[in-house]
Structures are given as structure tokens and as C-alpha cells.
Amino acid sequence: MLDLLLMISGLILLIVGGNWLLKGAVDLSFRLNIPKIVVGMTVVSFVTSAPELVVSAQSAFKGYPDLALSNVVGSNMANLGLVLGITLLIGRLDVRRSFYFTDWPVMMAASLLFFSFIYLDKYLGRTEGVIMVVSLFVFIIYLLRFQKPAVVEELPEFVNLLPIHNTVFYLGLGAVALWGGAELLISGAVNLANLFNVSERLVGISIVSVGTSIPEMAASVVAMVRKEKAISVGNLIGSNIFNLLAVMGITAIIQPIEVLDQRLLQHDIFWMLGISFLILPLVFFPSRQRLGWKEGLILLAVYAFFLISTFK
């Protein structure tokens, strides 16, 4: 019971800390006169992936590499299967042109790059981490050069400058909350795995990854209910790209990762590749450039089968 309470407390701190850090980071960026296009693509995207980054980096550093990997793989599965699936049950989404030419191809390329690095030698080292981070910067430069309208749409609504002391407060408290939340979450997850005699991978792929995906789920559902334009398939795909290239890349640079539980390579990573590929035919059939409740049910079913097969 205490371990579960630790995990829940950690998740709450991660979510709250992530929001505080985002507010402070965006406000500071505007104070420094950084162009909105750069803020939208770099600051916002990076900070919204901060919970996954902190959890994975601390897990690897503490000697729990499977928890670090399963958090990212599971989070990517949850973004497309759970978050997008639930969102589509609430309303319909029109797919933007950038999905075909940028979002989906880059997500698949990042997924295959990650797969090729870790599948062959069951190890993600600093060299691979540097390559992944450099690939992310190349992607960002491409977006800034050719996809400016799409990036501007991703900017947060709060752009009014805060008093400077509030900015510092949000930045400091957000960073502390993220660190503390990750500590509690990792401690609770490892203890829970030991208590029920299950692998760290199982806890990471299910509870931890879903927990770190809660901000995306909350934002997507609220935006859909309010009929706002802020939510798109591109938002979730962008989150997956950052998870793979930024979270895994930076984590590997800080602490190289060795796969201990082979089911990550024999099972989980193939499901991640599969659901990433599945998005493309779902967009085209039965109604082109549109996703509705039927596609949402398919994605939720795929995610449910993934979880069932994971615990077998």
C-alpha cells in the first residue's frame, strides 16, 4: 500500500512540476525575446517531455535500465493507443497535411533508428545517444525552416508575461517537483515489482508509462471536449518523437543502457513499431484524412491486447 502511495504521489508531483516548469520556461523564453516559433518547437516540446526524461534518466542512473526503457516504449504505446483512442471516442480529428510529409515519417524513422541501435547489441551507448540527439536537432531545424505554420499552432495559450519572481518560482519549484516526483515514482515502482515478484519492465510498461502520459491525455480530452484546435494527431506523434530521440538519447548520454529483460526486445518494441505504423492506414481508411470513433476503438483494442500479452 505504501509503495502504491509513493507511486501516486510521484506521478502527481511529476504532473504538477511539469506544468510549473512549462509556465516558467515559456515565460523566460519570451522575456529573452526568443522567437515564438523557436519557443513552440524547442522549449514547449522539450519541457512537456520532462517527466519521461527525468524518470528514465534517474532509473538508468540508479541501475534500473529496464524501467528506463519500458517507460519510453510504454509511453509511446499509451500516447497512440490509449490517449489518441480515448480522444477519438469523444470527437473526430481531421489530419493535417504535415502528418503525411513530416510527423508520421519522422516518427517511424525515429522508431526504426531506436530499434536498430538497441536490438542488435542490446545496448544503447553514448555514441548512439549523441546520434539520436543530433537527429532531433536536425528535425527541429527542418521544422523551423519548412513547417513554421504547424509549429505556431502548438504554442500554449498563456503568453502574458508573469512577474519575474513568479517566473523564477515556477522554474525552481517545477524542477524540484520533477526531481522529487521521479524519486518517489521509481522507488515505489521498484518496491512494487519486488513485492509482487514481477519485473521492473512490467511495472514500467504499464503503470509508470501510463502515469507519465497523463498530461497528454488530460490536455487532449479537455481540448476535444471544449472543441479547441490545440489537439491534433501531430501533438501526440511529436511527443513520441521527443520520447525516442530526446529522452532516450539524453538518458543514454548520461548513463548507457543495457537491456536486461529480453521481452523488451522480443515483444514490447515490436508492438511500439506496429502501432506507430498502424496510424497511417487508419488515416486513409475508411475516410481519408480523418480519424473518428471507429479508429479510436481499434487503437484502444490494440493497446488492450498489448497489455494482455505483456502480462502473459
Question: What are the language-model segments listed below?
Answer:
Residues 1-312:
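Hydrophobic alpha-helical segments, chiefly the membrane-spanning helices
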